[in-house]
Design a protein with these regions (language model features):
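Single conserved hydrophobic/aromatic residue that forms the stacking wall/gate
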Residues: 1-7, 11
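Membrane-interfacial entry segments at the cytosolic side of transmembrane helices
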Residues: 4, 71-79, 97-102, 127-143
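Short aromatic-rich membrane-water interface segments that cap or initiate transmembrane helices
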Residues: 8-9, 35-51, 252-256
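Hydrophobic alpha-helical membrane-insertion segments
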Residues: 9-19, 143-147
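Residues within alpha-helical transmembrane segments of multi-pass membrane proteins, especially transporters
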Residues: 17, 24, 53-56, 63, ...
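Membrane-helix interface motif
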Residues: 19-32
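Membrane-embedded alpha-helical segments of integral membrane proteins
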Residues: 42-123
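Accessory, solvent-exposed terminal regions and/or long lumenal/extracellular loops of proteins
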Residues: 85, 136, 145-280
Length: 280
């Protein structure tokens, strides 16, 4: 079928692009004895433009008739898409509008909505094992849509805060008061450890303690950083301890919204995969 063939071509090209970026440094090292690294800039500039057409195809897959490749109930889906576009546009405006953020949210929510509509439009809702097997492809698409929303929010709408603090200082993070409690140093067998302790939301009786620090390895003269992470259902907050200057410690705080949606989407896709395997 034309739709499935186009989707297959997109994912083949995506796989080959990732494979090229992975093995290219190895080829260069073998042929020219030079070491290079292929990182984020390559994958962001090549994989993402290829993935977007794939996700666009996925967004219309639930509403296609696989016998005729025509859209079923087109008026219903067009109306739903227009309403969703307006809602996402309003939401993006209040989240500091960003073009990629708008595209990502619209794509993710549309995949979710189209899959849900397809489930309720195409099948009689009878909760049994056969029902879950029949709707399994749509469930997988819902998982992808949720993951897209999580990836978009955590990358595009990330908020970064910088502070210069003394021990005992209080500062505000996302409307919550945080106490920079103290700095602790310890000597381990092969490294020296520096730990900054933070108390999050100290206005409540049950404040949460977060540790962020650095390790210094004298033999290799290498310093590694360990971020303190506060997990919440709608965001992850990262505390990063920097260097000390003029008796003040530099502290960076990153707020990544809806990281949990990425994991939720992956779990749903894993569930869908297990159901698909069990059918064989």
């Amino acid at each position: 079928l034309a739709g499935s063939s186009a989707a297959s071509d997109v994912y083949k090209r995506q796989t080959l692009t990732i494979l090229l970026g992975t093995i290219y440094p190895i080829i260069i090292e073998v042929l020219y004895n030079k070491r290079i690294s292929v990182g984020g800039p390559y994958f962001n500039s090549t994989v993402i433009p290829i993935m977007i057409p794939g996700f666009l195809l996925m967004s219309i897959a639930p509403i296609l008739s696989w016998q005729t490749n025509k859209i079923n109930n087109s008026k219903k889906y067009v109306l739903a898409f227009i309403i969703l576009s307006v809602l996402v546009l309003i939401q993006s405006y209040f989240l500091d509008f960003n073009t990629w953020g708008f595209v990502g949210l619209l794509l993710g929510f549309w995949i979710i909505l189209a899959s849900i509509i397809a489930i309720f439009s195409s099948y009689k809702i009878k909760i049994n094992i056969k029902f879950f097997k029949i709707i399994n492809p749509h469930v997988a698409h819902i998982g992808v849509g949720i993951a897209i929303v999580g990836i978009t929010c955590s990358s595009v709408f990330q908020n970064e805060l910088d502070f210069n603090l003394n021990e005992g200082d209080k500062f505000n993070v996302n409307g919550k008061t945080v106490l920079f409690e103290k700095i602790e140093t310890t000597n381990e067998i092969n490294f020296q450890s520096l730990r900054g302790k933070f108390l999050f939301d100290i206005e409540k009786n049950q404040s949460k303690e977060i540790e962020a620090g650095k390790n210094y390895y004298p033999v290799s003269k290498m310093i590694t950083s360990e971020a303190g992470i506060l997990h919440q259902w709608n965001k992850d907050i990262y505390f990063i301890l920097g260097d000390q200057k003029n008796n003040e410690w530099f502290v960076k705080v990153l707020i990544n919204p809806f990281v949990s949606f990425i994991w939720l989407g992956v779990i749903i896709m894993m569930y869908s995969g297990l159901i698909a395997v069990s059918r064989r």
